[in-house]
């Protein structure tokens, strides 16, 4: 878009701006009072999810105007372009085809003359062979012992997605197989890895090196340390050439879009899994990057995860905008950020299995839409992605809910919970106790969203209270209920947020599939590391950076 045709100049945007002037002082409690059936009109179901958007500060008229904005941005055509494999990642001139990773084997998707589905399922078949070999106790280390621990070495999308899903689906770990424990190490300082290396048996430890480019310094630093650890303990420090070869073959799997770099590093081609340049890192858990998930829950459950995401893909593609879950979720965010000036967003799962979901969404949303330049290179004169953070809701109640209830910031909240849990606990007494705990958790989830909406009016007594015991309410929130937390509903939940991000990016006219800010950080860090090591070139830096380096060098000289 040129400056004159940017979305904020559109009739739909201008109509929303005018409409917002009359909505800013409207309290949520009055919206429910003035229109019976408000909840039903702003609630939708799909793919095992119930999406309640009724606690946002909007009316039917608001949604009608937001849908007009989406159509003004050609959203329906954008959805087609995304799922058809057109080049929607404009800065890198390629498709963004994470949806292809969850297509069923009988599907066909021809992208630039090539059907990508067979390659996707060939990779899944290779993953399955590796998983079955581990679960049969047949993947053996250099000494012939079966692998018992798998450590995923990755960062960002190669870590957060697999970590989140593996934790969320821990209940689905297969019980009739050789047990393999899954671990994650991402920090470049080596602290996570160091803990594992003091506790694990090198003879039974397998490392998965996950890096799209296979140049990420965080991952390769950990990988080099892991390799040296194995060589020292299993191959006489690497001097035993025969054992060195066996160690490299049996203790490393590589996952990357760059097979030649995996081979250069020493990973056996038979133990390499590939993915493609058209899959962004933060969208990659659906393919080979998801190997730790498959090792944790088995391939059958991994395929159910894909099926749930694909169900949401079809919903996103085929459902009219006014009933489309990702579209409606995205429009609620657009309304809050761009028209009500709500620029903070908290993710609050009420289920301990979703402990890492907020961290996962931090990357998905802020790395995707934390942009200030349009696809045509114009500076955006409007806000884009809000600051997003979160924590398990029950814990957050004792951490930052004080700010939500009585602070000065307007914050949009997403409450997420499964409706049913613990149905399959065998012992009746234990099942009853756990179900009571789940009921308590659901009560807190619903109650907190109610208090954030109503403020003082949620309290049973209308007796006068001092100011420090007053609650203003009027904080917007979404409540997402899963029928159950299963591989299928989790897949749908993740895909829901992926598509929400795409909808917002389309309206803001930004590219959600690049991350040039991340690339700049890597470049500057590499240059700084060279100066730190050589003690030359500090004069090119700013005064603060030179001062900090001096502190480090003085400490090094003192030891």
UniProtKB/Swiss-Prot annotation:
Entries under InterPro entries matching the protein: G6P_Isomerase (IPR001672), G6P_Isomerase_C (IPR023096), Phosphoglucose_isomerase_CS (IPR018189), SIS_dom_sf (IPR046348), SIS_PGI_1 (IPR035476), SIS_PGI_2 (IPR035482)
A Pfam family hit: PGI
Keyword Translocase in annotation: no
Active site: 367 (proton donor), 398, 522
Pathway annotation from the record: Carbohydrate biosynthesis; gluconeogenesis; Carbohydrate degradation; glycolysis; D-glyceraldehyde 3-phosphate and glycerone phosphate from D-glucose: step 2/4
Subcellular location: Cytoplasm
Catalytic activity: alpha-D-glucose 6-phosphate = beta-D-fructose 6-phosphate
PROSITE patterns hit by this protein: P_GLUCOSE_ISOMERASE_1, P_GLUCOSE_ISOMERASE_2, P_GLUCOSE_ISOMERASE_3
CDD domains in the record: SIS_PGI_1 (cd05015), SIS_PGI_2 (cd05016)
Key words, A-Z: Cytoplasm, Gluconeogenesis, Glycolysis, Isomerase
Main subcellular location: cytoplasm
PANTHER family noted in UniProt: GLUCOSE-6-PHOSPHATE ISOMERASE
Function: Catalyzes the reversible isomerization of glucose-6-phosphate to fructose-6-phosphate.
Protein name as it appears in the record: Glucose-6-phosphate isomerase 2
Species of provenance: Chromohalobacter salexigens (strain ATCC BAA-138 / DSM 3043 / CIP 106854 / NCIMB 13768 / 1H11)
The gene coding this protein: pgi2
